[in-house]
UniProtKB/Swiss-Prot annotation:
Protein origin, superkingdom: Bacteria
The entry's keywords: ATP-binding, Cytoplasm, DNA damage, DNA repair, DNA replication, DNA-binding, Nucleotide-binding, SOS response
Predominant location category: cytoplasm
Nucleotide-binding among keywords: yes
Source species: Ligilactobacillus salivarius (strain UCC118) (Lactobacillus salivarius)
Function: The RecF protein is involved in DNA metabolism; it is required for DNA replication and normal SOS inducibility. RecF binds preferentially to single-stranded, linear DNA. It also seems to bind ATP.
NCBIfam families per record: recf
Classification via Pfam families: SMC_N (PF02463)
Protein name as annotated: DNA replication and repair protein RecF
Binding-site list for ATP: 30-37
InterPro entries the UniProt entry points to: DNA-binding_RecF, DNA-binding_RecF_CS, P-loop_NTPase, RecF/RecN/SMC_N, RecF_2
Amino acid sequence: MYLEKLELKHFRNYEDVNVAFSPQVNVLIGKNAQGKTNLLESIYVLAMARSHRTSNDREMVTFKKDAALIRGEVHQRLGNTKLELLISRKGKKAKVNHLEKARLSQYIGQLNVILFAPEDLALVKGAPSVRRRFIDMEFGQIDALYLHTLTEYRAVLRQRNKYLKELQTKKATDKVYLEILSEQLSESGSQIIFKRLEFLQELEKYADKLHNQITQGKEHLQFQYESTLKEYQGKSVLELKQSLIEQYKTMMDKEIFQGTTLLGPHRDDVRFMLNDKNVQVYGSQGQQRTAALSVKLAEIDLMKEKTHEYPILLLDDVLSELDGARQTHLLKTIQNKVQTFLTTPGLSDVAQQLINKPKIFRIDNGKITEENSFTIEEE
């Protein structure tokens, strides 16, 4: 899978752009604040129907314009697919081969992307919400049912939290309705926990192998899912649902007192273990970065296994955050395998030696021009 063409209209600082890409490596060079990250964001939004940088869609629309339009042509092994996403005050409209999709969940998965930005190096040591988002966004691309279940869960969770607030402030007194919401939340929550455990087990297989290679056999990487549910390992979906229902009953008074849902996959976490030690607590910064890199690279192989297509890799100024050895491993792993978009003010000697015949684009205030050689930018 690769993105052949991209068209942008009124997306951030891009007024009207049409560009054709290489199926291999595309290097975006230019000074800061010229639009390199905006271009990567547009590809991410085309794939995921949401931004990784903002929850406010209006920020993606050029100032004083009514809407932004992103179009892309995706090459897949079974043929080409045309994608279109319109972002306006009324919301988003998504089309696949000119046919509008009723729900965005029906659209996501047409173009699979993996984004690796400097903040992703905090995947290991960041807040639990960072790791939950990582699981949900990456797994959601390869499992439409998981994405649908997640949407259902979040809708019921909002209802339940609202009702808990009403019980807390005595605006409501009917606990039977709370039990109904608890059962609905347990239905979708149990499926999410089960799928996450399954996903992490599959991802670990690739991540451990890559991490072992990077560390020259010195370290093994494992994932440990941490659930607010007391017993969850080795349980079926039905058993997980029953456990959730029972724990919601036990915690009812506490949840009413606090006015929020204290149990469920929205509060779960993942631990990264190196040789059976928690790297979040005991690992050096170098070990944490290597673990994050291993996890990101593992996604490539897992997506290939699940979808039979390699995803697109978006590297947003991440090479500057990695030393020479990690740069080498990253670039060797993706070479001649994954379409890659790489933003940088200028490439290191290591990167220039390893990247084979890249297509180079200079970004200057929302204008894109193709170049023939690397130039190091002065900041």
